[in-house]
Amino acid sequence: MTAEGPSPPARWHRRLPGLWAAALLLLGLPRLSVRADGKFFVLESQNGSQGLQLEAARLSCKSRGAHLASADELRRVVQDCSFAVCTTGWLADGTLGTTVCSKGSGEQQIMRAVDVRIESNPVPGGTYSALCIKDEEKPCGDPPSFPHTILQGRTGLEMGDELLYVCAPGHIMGHRETAFTLLCNSCGEWYGLVQACGKDEAEAHIDYEDNFPDDRSVSFRELMEDSRTEADEDRGQGDSSEEAPKQDRLVSISVGRENIARDKVFVPTTGLPGAGSSVPADSPGSRLLQKHLFWFPAEAFHKPGLEKEVDDDTKKQFSAGDNHSGVKLVPGEPETKVIYGNTDGPSGPFVGKNDSKAGDPVVSSSDESWLDGYPVTEGAWRKTEAEEEEDGDRGDGSVGLDENVLVTPDQPILVEVKKPKSSTLTPSEGMTHSSVLPSQMLDVEALALRPVNASETEGIGDGDLTKYQSTLPWRFITEESPMATLSYELTSSTLEILTVNTVKQTPNHIPSTIMATTQPPVETTVPEIQDSFPYLLSEDFFGQEGPGPGASEELHPTLESCVGDGCPGLSRGPVIATIVTVLCLLLLLAGVGMVWGYRKCQHKSSVYKLNVGQRQARHYHQQIEMEKV
């Protein structure tokens, strides 16, 4: 009697556990998360708390057309690719590979894998991620095409293979090169230095990093024209043409090669924003690092379309030679670009054309002399006619709260002596400026500065305020005035020096606040170059004749100085001055409040429209007037 084999139902029952395990594995695969980086990718559990066993990792990679990476493949990926996944996963031989990450140097500190650790004895039954590499016939895709370039040969389309390109007949490469190669790296990308083929010696270097898709070509005609124009401009600039070729180098990272060059590269960004402009970049992973782009003052450069209004209060002076904020100015033609960059970019100025895009700041150079970042001209201390006309439109004579105080170098400080109850300062043609006399103790009533001959003085009208610039000596008339009598204690030993910073443009505005009479006396000197300011009052001035040629000038006697016990007491002077100043400030604040309230009352009503829908808006409009209380 022969023994019968197991019946078909029995065989199905024996296979059920294996089928259930396979079904559970297939159901679990979609819940895996994938972190891909080109040809290399990582499979791990969805929640990150549980990994995969070795067999499950193999099946997971195989289901996605890949296989577990070997130790050599993992090292090659970390070395050549910009791999930013830090994890521990299964390798093909059952060992564990761990990618060690570190933050890169520079402004953008990005985590990047820099090393690999191999663990040959993993914990039995442990679960880890799966380190997979794709199994494709063309990991880098079809060979790219370039203008006037012929693909002469190739070793293959797998990882590590190279493509050899030569120029078409009648075209040559720059730097006397005859061919260039592209490498299919472990990241699944064609990588290398692309030489542009042209009809002359003009050259262009391109770091090929996905700049050219596989299905299209990019024209280099505009790039060649821009390069020729920039080369001509560089020859006229001197040493600018010698610095550019030194920077046309590239970081070459080749699988299986030991020589690795690390340097800067010029990347013409054809097909990207700002076509035709030279962009400094680090390769691989070139990034635009140009920052801190500023304009020079608009008064020095008058170029259509590039002028920019700059407020005098917000102008900054930049000093050349600073490592962090150096301004590289290329002197020469007005058509020269000057790009202000930091130390991250290549050294030397970048010279380009005027038709650049992407918002490159462009200024034209000037032959004028420069002092502290501003052009020095003959009229540096005077207003332009346009500014005087704008100031003339304000001719109501009032002094605004936001007006600047008149500060001129080496000019005497003028003290306004007014009635104690006055709240605002309203200049007029008859305004008198009393100057503090640097002599002994004087009982000053009022001293008025008036020109000798009105016809011999020139005045510049600024509203109701008149600024006199005289070339003749002034005479001083002592007159009685109903103003409050002020006492000053002035000694030659307590004079202080007032340092006045040089300003570019001095607005012809009078001070908006009255200077306190208790201010310490100051001593200034009049420049000998330009006699455009009133003379200082001193004892030597009253003891001699004026230097001017006027014959009708008279020298009136000055006030007698008091000596001994006859001098009036000065104990109440500072107190009275303080009270007067406080009252003036309070009245000024009250006036500001009244003006603000008046303006607010002018806009007391607003009209609003009611949106009632698209259909009803044709036949019905409703207005609501709301009055502010």
UniProtKB/Swiss-Prot annotation:
CDD domains: CCP, Link_domain_KIAA0527_like. The chain crosses the membrane at residues 575-595. Coiled coil: none annotated. Residues 39-134 form the Link domain. Keywords: Disulfide bond, Membrane, Signal, Sushi, Transmembrane, Transmembrane helix. It comes from the Eukaryota. GO terms for molecular function: hyaluronic acid binding. The keyword Metal-binding does not apply. It holds the Pfam family Xlink. Residues 225-249 have a biased composition (Basic and acidic residues). InterPro entries: C-type_lectin-like/link_sf (IPR016186), CTDL_fold (IPR016187), Link_dom (IPR000538), SUSD5_Link_domain (IPR042059), Sushi/SCR/CCP_sf (IPR035976), Sushi_domain_protein (IPR053298), Sushi_SCR_CCP_dom (IPR000436). GO terms for cellular component: membrane. It is found in: Membrane. Residues 1-35 form the signal peptide. It is a single-pass type I membrane protein. GO terms for biological process: cell adhesion; Notch signaling pathway. Disulfide bonds join C61-C132, C140-C184, C167-C197. Residues 36-574 are extracellular. Its main location: membrane. Residues 225-252, 344-403 are annotated as: Disordered. The keyword Aminoacyl-tRNA synthetase does not apply. Residues 596-629 are cytoplasmic. Residues 138-199 form the Sushi domain. This is Sushi domain-containing protein 5. It comes from Homo sapiens (Human). The gene is SUSD5.
